[in-house]
């Protein structure tokens, strides 16, 4: 048997009662890639395949307690953020990432629901841009989120490239602008890095958000490029070794 310890990946996001997004989807993905998933839950959502019925933010003190517990005993080798609910929670999360030297960080800036509703206040959107993006090795907005973060109209591959370049100027190491909302028969994702631009195009597949295997099978070339992109962008860790407990 392989005696090597599993690497730890942390997801900081909201809980989705429907299991198709948020913490639940992240943990399924982590398991697919053979890493041990840990969580910091920042919001509770009551939702299903039809829509979101309610959202409630977790108190800042509880979010901070979760972050502290993981820093003491289960520090991540990599982490991602999803919906962070409120400006204060974004600041709390960004502060913990800086203080613990955690990385590489993937920021999925969940700001707009599938029905088009804004999920964050304007203040929270600004804090994501100012506090979280400079910590990110990779930011992965969809078209709506890229438009919010950059203040640009994003509607095709060319504007996706320009938005990605703007996100790098805000401090992100790389930007993957996801074009799943484009109204045509193909999906085009645009990866912008300091070395240039790559486009990934694949046929649109009608599937549910819960169909993880269906949604991930076409992206293996992208995963290879992303891993090669993120590796040199990883910031040196300033994590201190935690004391052993008796």
Predicted regions and their residues:
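Short pre-catalytic strand/loop immediately N-terminal to key active-site residues, enriched for Gly-Thr
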Residues: 12-18, 198-211
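Intrinsically disordered, low-complexity polyampholyte segments enriched for Lys and acidic residues
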Residues: 2, 26, 130, 161, ...
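Short, small-residue alpha-helix embedded
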Residues: 24, 29, 147-148, 206-219
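Nucleotide and nucleotide-moiety/phosphate-recognizing core
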Residues: 87-102, 162, 173, 191, ...
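Glycine-rich beta-alpha junction loops
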Residues: 44-45, 85, 111-113, 145, ...
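Conserved N-terminal subdomain of the carbohydrate kinase-like
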Residues: 3-11, 23, 27-119
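Conserved phosphate/ATP/ADP-binding segment of small-molecule kinases
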Residues: 122-196
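Low-acidity, Ser/Thr- and Arg-rich intrinsically disordered low-complexity segments
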Residues: 211-220, 227, 231, 235-245
């Amino acid at each position: 048997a392989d005696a090597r310890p599993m690497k730890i990946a942390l997801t900081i996001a909201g809980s989705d009662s429907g299991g198709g997004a948020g913490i639940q989807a992240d943990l399924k993905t982590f398991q697919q890639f053979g890493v041990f998933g840990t969580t910091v839950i920042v919001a509770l959502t009551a939702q299903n395949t039809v829509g979101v019925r309610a959202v409630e933010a977790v108190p800042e003190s509880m979010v901070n307690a979760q972050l502290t517990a993981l820093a003491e005993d289960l520090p991540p080798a990599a982490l991602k953020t999803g919906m962070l609910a409120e400006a204060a929670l974004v600041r709390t999360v960004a502060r913990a990432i800086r203080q613990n030297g955690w990385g590489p960080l993937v920021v999925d800036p969940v700001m707009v629901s599938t029905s088009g509703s804004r999920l964050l206040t304007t203040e929270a959107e600004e804090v994501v841009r100012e506090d979280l993006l400079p910590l990110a090795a990779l930011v992965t907005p969809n078209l709506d989120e890229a438009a919010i973060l950059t203040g640009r109209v994003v509607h095709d591959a060319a504007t996706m490239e320009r938005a990605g370049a703007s996100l790098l100027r805000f401090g992100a190491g790389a930007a993957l602008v996801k074009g799943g909302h484009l109204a045509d028969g193909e999906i085009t994702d645009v990866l912008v890095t300091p070395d240039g631009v790559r486009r990934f195009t694949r046929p649109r597949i009608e599937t549910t958000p819960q169909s993880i295997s269906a949604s991930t099978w076409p992206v293996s070339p992208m995963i290879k490029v992303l891993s090669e992109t993120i590796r040199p962008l990883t910031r040196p860790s300033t994590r201190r070794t935690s004391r052993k407990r008796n």
